[in-house]
Each structure stands twice: as structure tokens, then as C-alpha cells.
Swiss-Prot record:
It comes from Measles virus (strain Yamagata-1). GO terms for cellular component: host cell plasma membrane; membrane; viral envelope. GO terms for biological process: virion assembly. Keywords: Host cell membrane, Host membrane, Host-virus interaction, Lipid-binding, Membrane, Viral envelope protein, Viral matrix protein, Virion. Pfam families: Matrix_Paramyxo_C, Matrix_Paramyxo_N. This is Matrix protein.
Length: 300
């Protein structure tokens, strides 16, 4: 299972009521447990998690759990020894957390994703950044319908003003062995044969899960690590959208394929080719995903 707590970064030992500085969400990673969700939430809310600001290439937050979990059996050391995360991925306003006052993270609620098999697969970052001459980049433009923030204590104030939001993910490149470029129609045919299925989960925040149920290009299959299922967490793709979805309900309303030149220099020459799903080529497992409920992605 993958747990995703959301809570408040606040002063550790205030003389009066705790002063909340910002909202945060440190993904603790994967673990195994047979406990009920209510028991896992109780343990998360009682945890003593220390938060400290630090910096490297960018500003970071260090989370240290002084009360290691007993119900889930962690697969990694993060839930027991702590973790250091990009501040923009784990906090909505790190600039408000003071250095001269000890800070802690207090969990308010959490979501739990139970994959249908042993885990999930994310495409390596180097492969996502790989570009090739005379190749066509296959991207997806995902449109989410966002309901207003949940609960009386809203952390996100502008959720009502943003009924829909989009983010783009890179799937891979279509490339011939010879120095010839595939036509847009040929790429569209290959996409239709893939039989793509999409759903939302809760790994590292609200995550997009894809599964190919049909025939896949050998080159594209190799780029995806010879896997037919992939996970794309928005916390790695679009940090602003990820923070927006912390306290919002959302569902997929539209998925479009976008064909672009693989090499950035050619973007100024060739226009985008947008393929709308008018014939139901893409299948979406349509469930409204609230942030404070268990989420189940498609079969991995």
C-alpha cells in the first residue's frame, strides 16, 4: 500500500494553541499492513514528525519521525528514519516556516492506495528526457475536473475558481529504424492499437496510471522498460497542480494525444498535432477521487 498523509506544518511547543505555518504532505512510501484505514490514520495523527528546512540545489524539507510506525511494515527506510524532499513538492508555503522555531508535521487525514499487484512502475527520468532526431514525441494532455475544496478548514482557496486543470505527460517517442519520420496518421493508428486505459490513484499525491491492453510499438515498449503499466505522479510533473489537488476532489474528463517533434529545435518549425478521443479509443476508469479516501488504480 502507498500512504499519502496531508496535514499542517506548525510550531512544535507553542505556549498557546499551535500556530499553523503551512500545509504539507510528505509521502512516506510503501508498506504492508492488514490494519484498517482508521487504525492507520490514528497512528499517523499520533506520530511525532519533526520538520526542518534545508537546501541543496533547491530548498528542501527534512521530515524525521520520532515515533516509527508499528502497523505498516515499511518497504523502505523513509517511514522509520525520515526523508528529505523538494520543499515545493511537500509544502505549499515553505517560506512561512521559521528556522528559529522548531516545527512539526501534524497529519490531519490520509489517503491509501492499494495496487492490485506488487507495486507500480514509473518511467526513469532519463528516458523521459531522451530526445531523438526524426522522431515523433507521444504526449498526453490530461484534463481534470476539480470540485471545490473538501471540509470547513480549506487550505486551498482558489479551488472554486479552477473547475478544470490540465497537465501533460510524455509517454515516449515513435521512431523508425531508418532516417524517416512517421506521419501523424501512422502514429495515430499505433496509438489506437495500444488500447490505453487510464485511472487516478494516490501515489505521491494524486497520480495518473496508464495501462496498455493492446499491441505496442517495440521501440516504445523498450522506452517504457518493457512494461505495459506506468504511473505518473503530478508531484514530479506539475508541483502547483499537485498542491491544488491536496484538498480537492477530481476526476478525468478528457484525454488527448499530442504529437510533437522530439527535438526541441524543431518545435518552432512543426505545429502540434492534437488527437481528440472522438471514437472512444481511450478508456477511463471514471471514479471521482476525493483526497481523503482510499484510491485504487487500474491493475498494475
Amino acid at each position: 500500500m502507498h500512504m499519502f498523509p496531508l496535514g499542517v506544518v506548525e510550531d512544535s511547543d507553542p505556549p498557546g494553541p499551535p500556530i499553523g505555518r503551512a500545509s504539507g504532505s510528505p509521502p512516506p512510501g510503501a508498506g504492508r499492513s492488514t490494519a484498517k484505514p482508521e487504525e492507520l490514520l490514528k497512528e499517523a495523527t499520533e506520530a511525532n514528525i519533526v520538520v526542518r528546512r534545508t537546501a541543496g540545489l533547491n530548498e528542501k524539507l527534512a521530515f524525521h519521525n520520532n515515533t516509527p510506525p508499528t502497523l505498516p511494515t515499511p518497504r523502505r527506510k523513509a517511514p522509520t528514519t525520515g526523508s528529505v524532499l523538494n520543499a515545493n513538492q511537500a509544502c505549499n508555503a515553505v517560506n512561512l516556516a521559521p528556522l528559529d522555531t522548531p516545527q512539526r508535521f501534524r497529519a490531519v487525514y490520509m489517503s491509501i492506495t492499494r495496487p492490485l499487484d506488487n507495486g507500480y512502475y514509473t518511467v526513469p527520468r532519463r528516458m523521459l528526457e531522451f530526445r531523438s532526431v526524426n522522431a515523433v514525441a507521444f504526449n498526453l494532455l490530461v484534463t481534470l475536473r476539480i470540485d471545490k475544496a473538501i471540509g470547513p478548514g480549506k487550505i486551498i482557496d482558489n479551488a472554486e475558481q479552477l473547475p478544470e486543470a490540465t497537465f501533460m505527460v510524455h509517454i515516449g517517442d515513435f521512431r523508425r529504424k531508418k532516417s524517416e519520420v512517421y506521419s501523424a496518421d501512422y502514429c495515430k493508428m499505433k496509438i489506437e492499437k495500444m488500447g490505453l486505459v487510464f485511472a487516478l490513484g494516490g501515489i505521491g499525491g494524486t497520480s495518473l496510471h496508464t495501462r496498455s491492453t493492446g499491441k505496442m510499438s517495440k521501440t516504445l515498449h523498450a522506452q517504457l522498460g518493457f512494461k505495459k503499466t506506468s504511473c505518473y505522479p503530478p508531484m514530479d510533473i506539475n508541483e502547483d497542480l499537485n498542491r491544488l489537488l491536496w484538498r480537492s476532489r477530481c476526476k478525468i474528463v478528457r484525454i488527448q494525444a499530442v504529437l510533437q517533434p522530439s527535438v526541441p529545435q524543431e518545435l518552432r518549425i512543426y505545429d502540434d498535432v492534437i488527437i481528440n478521443d472522438d471514437q472512444g479509443v481511450f478508456k477511463v476508469l471514471q471514479t471521482v477521487v476525493p483526497s481523503n479516501a482510499r484510491k485504487r488504480p487500474p491493475s498494475q
